[in-house]
Amino acid sequence: MATQKLLLPYHFTHLDQKALDFVIDTFSRLENITVTVFNAYTPIPEIDTAATSVTGKLKGSLSYLSQKIKENETALNEVKDKLIEGGFAEKQVNCIFRPRKKDIAGEIIDLVASDHFDTIVLNRKHARVTRFFSGSISHKVIMSLKDVTICIVS
């Protein structure tokens, strides 16, 4: 049987933790599966902070954002470790942490298409049901992809 590829978009919320727990509980006993944990972050703009006094004040904010990105990368690797502790072999788990060029839904759709994922595990906010069907990431992904199993954890 061919190896199944599962994508777990992760953005450090409590709902993402629920999706992570679902993946561990449901898929960790399978040997023919790989899990990719994915996070696309907003890149920090390139600004010459020494040019003027106004842009010089941005240096602290840009430094904070750079630090936050590094912390998120470390946290994503901790998610990988949780998957391994949950029963996946190390060779079954990958991380993708990259700057985004589109909205989150577009990044997920492009990654699924380029890397041929079989399953995606998403979550949705506990908000009005109309948001689920109107403008959410889950809705955009569901409407855009074909021949992919999508699990929604709420």
Language model features: what each stretch is:
Residues I142-S154:
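Short, flexible loop segments at boundaries between secondary-structure elements
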Residues T119-K140, S144:
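Glycine-rich, Arg-bearing micro-motifs that act as flexible, cationic patches
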Residues D81-T119, H139:
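Structural beta-alpha unit
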Residues F22, E71-V79, E107:
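Short, solvent-exposed amphipathic alpha-helices that sit
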Residues A2-S61:
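Small/aliphatic-rich secondary-structure junction motif
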Residues L58-T74:
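A short acidic, glycine-rich active-site loop
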